[in-house]
């Protein structure tokens, strides 16, 4: 079936239930960024494969909202579907709640699966549509009636992350969170986020592609903890370990029953941005809801010394693999056929040679030429193209190791470049290395740092429509909060001070539609630089250790400071990576990291 046929079947079900609109989001029951195959309802209906987007289906129309990363991709994939593309943040584009207010009649009904809609999103719709007395119907997943061959819920075995990697035991983490609960006046903490449950319990799984988590909820009290999980995924050994730390098991779907049974006067802590609407609706009226940012977010974001050291080890392994890949690509292009997909598979195979490699950390982006202008392009059998010994290849990839999570982008010259390609590459590189060299007082937030990366681009009248940096989990999600580097404070729902031990990305880019794209990305860890009478200064240490492409740099555009920073980084790369290379690969790395001279 194509999207037109699928939407027609969905509208039949909507009509049976007298629904005036049906909302289909990208999320699973846990507001995860990446979701298992079972939860890809929006993709199934619309054909749009991006990782962010919301579909609204009306009786005679449909619209899909997505952000700037996916404007080009969505416009291509939605063609002929009858679904209007809503470019979020652009002039004249309504937000979803306002759209629903304007298109649903008075006393009408909006349907959705309330397990996939966040409490915050449902509340925003309710506030916007209240005057028209529009009601919600959230008990049914109508997509399930249309998607006849829908994949089952994943149920992969859990595994324990040893304290040598985590740095804190399960008991220590539980005590930390219970301490925060006391501070916040909460008697119960409902934890629906898969990464938070995994972090807190030092457990990992394989229920979500690219993210080693497992389908679960945790109900935490001062003296008890109940893990709602698919029982067949938990070995007897892990169950015994959990029990010894005061954690008991319950069926996965029991979370709603357990919340509904909370006694009168219970003060329930939950994060409305992460808790689904059905959880909130299950809370008894006699209980008090404390809608707060989850305290686990910040705990998880500030990496332990053990996590930081393990991440350094992971990035050396990753740096070796990516460096070998760049060498292979530059020396093979034009001699053997190489496509975007075959290059992607080559890089994955090189990473898999590393000890303790688990999986990729997201869908790899190998984008040649004009495909590089599609910010989150992912090559498929339908879109794959051959690469030629000229122009640029944008490679944004990452991996999961026992020692940590990686995310790196390198834009690679495959042969001769135009002056425009070199100019854009060099401007992006300047912003990237200037942010990487930041030294700042504690108390700064991501929006304070963002302009360091954008200034060389803004001075040239250029910009990019995505964040400059995102937090990264430890053997968890490649994107996490609460830290974020973005200049536009209007887009920031929650603001976060940059703390020592945080790990986030530094990834400016420029994308020229129909031509090419350039993005350069390192992960950095925040460390203390100095403390003096002015305060506590922090700095950024690069974790990613892979050479930039000297073949793409216009040296005349670099300042003396830029040259100094570039050479210092390349010296660090050579020192870390060279012991693991030999022969021609080592000789190439020497050349790739040779100091450049200021023009």
What feature does the model see in each segment?
Residues 1-599:
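Active-site neighborhoods and metal-handling regions in enzymes and metal-associated proteins
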């Amino acid at each position: 079936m194509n999207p037109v046929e699928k939407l027609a079947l969905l509208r039949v079900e909507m009509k049976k239930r007298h629904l005036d609109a049906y909302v289909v989001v990208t999320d699973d029951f846990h507001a995860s960024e990446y979701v298992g195959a079972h939860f890809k309802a929006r993709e199934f209906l619309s054909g749009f494969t991006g990782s962010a987007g919301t579909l609204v289906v009306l009786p005679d129309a449909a619209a899909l909202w997505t952000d700037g990363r996916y404007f080009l991709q969505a416009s291509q994939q939605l063609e002929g579907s009858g679904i209007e593309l809503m470019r979020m943040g652009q002039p004249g584009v309504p937000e979803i709640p306002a759209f629903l207010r304007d298109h649903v009649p008075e006393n009408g009904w909006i349907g959705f699966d309330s397990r996939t809609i966040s409490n915050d999103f449902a509340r925003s719709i309710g506030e916007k549509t209240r005057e028209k007395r529009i009601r919600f119907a959230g008990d049914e997943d109508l997509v399930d009636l249309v998607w006849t061959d829908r994949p089952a819920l994943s149920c992969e075995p859990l595994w324990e992350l040893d304290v040598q990697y985590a740095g804190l035991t399960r008991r220590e983490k539980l005590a930390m969170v219970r301490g925060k609960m006391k501070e916040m006046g909460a008697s119960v903490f409902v934890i629906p986020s898969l990464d938070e449950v995994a972090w807190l319990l030092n457990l990992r799984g394989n229920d979500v592609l690219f993210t080693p988590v497992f389908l679960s909820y945790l109900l935490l009290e001062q003296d008890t903890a109940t893990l709602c999980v698919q029982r067949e995924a938990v070995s007897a050994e892990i169950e015994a370990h959990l029990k010894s730390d005061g954690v008991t098991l319950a069926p996965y779907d029991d979370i709603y029953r357990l919340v509904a049974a909370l006694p009168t006067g219970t003060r329930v802590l939950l994060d409305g941005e992460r808790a689904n609407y059905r959880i909130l609706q299950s809370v008894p009226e006699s209980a008090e809801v404390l809608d707060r940012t989850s305290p686990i977010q910040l705990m998880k974001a500030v990496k332990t010394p053990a996590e930081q050291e393990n991440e350094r080890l992971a990035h050396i392994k990753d740096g070796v693999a990516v460096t070998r890949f760049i060498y292979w690509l530059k020396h093979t292009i034009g001699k053997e056929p190489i496509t975007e997909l075959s290059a992607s598979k080559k890089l994955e195979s090189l990473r898999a040679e590393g000890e303790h490699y688990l999986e990729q950390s997201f869908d790899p982006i190998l984008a040649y030429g004009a495909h590089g202008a599609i910010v989150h392009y992912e090559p498929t059998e339908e879109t794959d193209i051959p690469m030629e010994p000229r122009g640029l290849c944008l490679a944004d990839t990452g991996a999961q190791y026992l020692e940590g999570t990686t995310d790196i982008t390198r834009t690679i010259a495959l042969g001769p470049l135009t002056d425009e390609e070199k100019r854009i590459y060099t401007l992006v590189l300047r912003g990237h290395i200037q942010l990487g060299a930041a030294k700042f007082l504690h108390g700064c937030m991501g929006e304070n740092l963002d302009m360091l990366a954008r200034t060389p681009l803004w001075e040239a009248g250029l910009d990019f429509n995505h964040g400059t940096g995102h937090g990264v989990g430890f053997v968890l999600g490649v994107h996490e909060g609460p830290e974020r580097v973005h200049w536009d404070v209007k887009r920031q729902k929650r603001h976060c001070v940059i703390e020592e031990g945080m790990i986030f990305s530094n990834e400016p880019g420029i994308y020229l539609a129909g031509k090419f794209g350039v993005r350069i990305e390192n992960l950095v860890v925040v460390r203390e630089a100095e403390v003096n009478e002015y305060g506590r200064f922090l700095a950024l240490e690069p974790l990613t250790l892979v050479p930039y492409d000297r073949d793409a740099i216009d040296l005349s555009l670099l300042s003396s400071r830029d040259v100094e920073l570039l050479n210092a980084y390349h010296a660090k790369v050579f020192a870390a990576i060279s012991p693991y290379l030999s022969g021609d690969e080592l000789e190439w790395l020497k050349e790739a990291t040779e100091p450049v001279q200021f023009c």
